[in-house]
Amino acid sequence: MSNNQQTLGFQTEVKQLLQLMIHSLYSNKEIFLRELISNASDAADKLRFKALSAPELYEGDGDLKVRIRFDEKKGTLTVSDNGIGMTREQATEHLGTIAKSGTKEFLTALGQDQAKDSQLIGQFGVGFYSAFIVADKVEVRSRAAGVPAEQGVLWTSAGEGEYSVEDIEKKERGTEITLFLREDEKEFLNEWRLREIIGKYSDHIGLPVEILTKEFDEEGKESDVKWEKINKAQALWTRAKGEISDEEYQEFYKHISHDFADPLVWQHNKVEGNQEYTSLLYVPSKAPWDLFNREQKHGLKLYVQRVFIMDDAEVFMPNYLRFMRGLLDSNDLPLNVSREILQDNKTTAALRKALTKRSLQMLEKLAKDEAEKYATFWKEFGLVLKEGVGEDFANREQIAKLFRFASTHTDSSEQSVSLADYIARMKEGQKAVYYITADSYVAAKNSPHLELFNKKGIEVLLLSDRIDEWMLSYLTEFDGKPLQSITKADLDLGDLADKTEAEKEKAQDEALSGFIERVKTLLGERVKDVRLTHRLTDTPAVVSTDNDQMTTQMAKLFAMSGQPVPEVKYTFELNPDHALVKKTAALTDESAFADWVELLLEQAMLSERGTLENPTAFIKRVNTLLAG
C-alpha cells in the first residue's frame, strides 16, 4: 500500500544548514552514525515515558533496541529502532523544518571558517540531517506507537531543495532510516568499521545497539546471519565512576548535548540518604549560539529510577547556570511527574539547591586547579554567571568569588583578576575595592578619573561589560570591603589621602572660590554642582555623579532596553593645576570666559558619555577659540 504522495520544499533554513553542514563537517563525517543512534535512543526514551501511563503502546514488544545493517550490493546502510515512531505530520514537521527560534540569525553568523563553522553547527544540533554528509539520498520509514500499521509514513529526500512524504503500511512500530551512500563513502559498508564507530561513540547508551553479522562455517562459507549486541547497553551514569574512562564521559556529553567539542570539566555523583539521586554535570567549553535567548530551552535531562522523563528540565538549575549540561536520575520523584508538578515540589527545591551548590563548587575547583581552562570558561560564560548575584542571594558571595575582571594591575584587556586577588594587593589603609565602568576596556583604561589612582599606584578594576552596572547594583561589597566607583563626586580615599597635599588643596579652594561662583552662575541648573577637584593630573575637567544618583553607564543600559531614563545631573569638577583652567579663571571678558567654560564642560561630557547633545555647537566653539 502506498498513496497520497506529496512533494514539499524544505524550509529555507534547512536548505542552508544542509549545504553548510555537508561542507564544514565532512572531515568528521563518521559522526552521522552517532547522531542517528542518539536519535534512536531518544525515541526509545520517549516511548518508555509514554508507556508509563499507556503500556499498550509497547504493542507486546517492550524489548527496545537500535539495529544497524548494511547491503553492499545496494550501497545502503540502515539504522532502525522500535521507539516512539512518527506520524506523517510529525515527519513533515521534524524532518522538513527547524523549529528553533533565532535560526536565521544563527545561519547568518556562519562564515567561511570551516573549523569555526563545524563547532557552531555542532552546537546547533544537526541530528538527522547529518545523514546527508555521506548519503545522496535518505529514506525514512516510520510508524508512531499506538496507530494502525497502514498509518505508516515514508519520507524521502536527496538533501537538496525538496522532500516527499507518502502513506505506507509498516507493521513494526518505530523508525527505519536508510542511507543510500555516495560512491566515495563505501567505507561505511564494512562491519568492522561500523563496530569501531559504535564502540567509539555509542558504548555509553543504555539501549542495546545490534548489528546484523554474518557467521561462517569451517570452510569459510556463509552459514547464517544474526543480530549481535555490540555496546555495553548500560546507562553510563549507573556504572561505577572507576569503570568509566574520560573518553566515555566525553562521548556521553556529546550524546546528550549534541555538542561537537569536549566539555571543560564534569562531575559524576551518587547521593544516598534523605535524598537518593545520581547527577552527572558538565561544563561546556563553548557557549551555544542562543545562550542569551531567554525563550530557548535549557536544563538537565531528567530520569526517575532510570526511566527517561523529559529533556530540558530547567527547574533544577537557576537561570544564571543555564549553560550547565548533564542529567539527573532521582529515586524520590514520582514516575508520573510533569513540569507543573516539578514547579511546586519540596523534592525539586532540595535537588535544585544541591545541584546549584555542586555546580558552583565545580567552577571554584576549576578556577583553583586549572586556570587556563577557567579562563576559557570565563570568556564563554562570564556574562551569564554575572546574572547570579541578582538572582541568587544565598550564594552571592560564592558566585562573586568566580568573577574575573580587567584591572590596571595587569595592563591587559583580559579579564583575569578576581576580587580576592584585588583584596590581597590592597594598599595599607585602603578600605574599598575601586572600579570604573565604561563602554569599552579602552575607554575605561583611558578615563581621566584614573589619573589620581595611577599616580598613587592604587589598583582599579576596569569594567566594560554591558551587564556590569546592573551587577554592581546587587554586588555592593565583597569579603567585608565595599565596592566603590571612582567616578563618584563624593569619592573619599580616607587614609590613602596625602595630608600635605590636603593643606595645599584647601588653600586653592579658598583662592579660587570666586572663580567657582562665576562658573556656577554661568551654568545654573544645567549641572548639580561645580567644584575644584584634586584627583586629576593631565585633564582639565571631569563630570561625576553622586553616590545616590544613577551612573552614566546605568542610564545607557536603561536607554538600550527601551526604558525611560531619569535625567542625570552631573557635578562639574575643575582641575586648578591645569593651564586651561588657570587661563579661564584669569579671564575678565565674560564672553570669552563663557566660551572656555562651555568648552571645558563639553570636553568633560564627551569624555564621560561618549556623545554630546549638540556636537555642531561644540565644533563651532573649538574652531572659534582655535582661530583666536
UniProtKB/Swiss-Prot annotation:
Gene for this chain: htpG
Question: Which keywords does the record carry?
Answer: ATP-binding, Chaperone, Cytoplasm, Nucleotide-binding, Stress response
This protein's major location comes to cytoplasm
- Whether Hydrolase counts among this entry's keywords is no
Q: Name one GO molecular function term.
A: ATP-dependent protein folding chaperone
Quaternary context? Homodimer.
Q: What is this protein called?
A: Chaperone protein HtpG
Q: Name one GO cellular component term.
A: cytoplasm
Xref: Pfam families: HATPase_c_3, HSP90
Protein purpose: Molecular chaperone. Has ATPase activity.
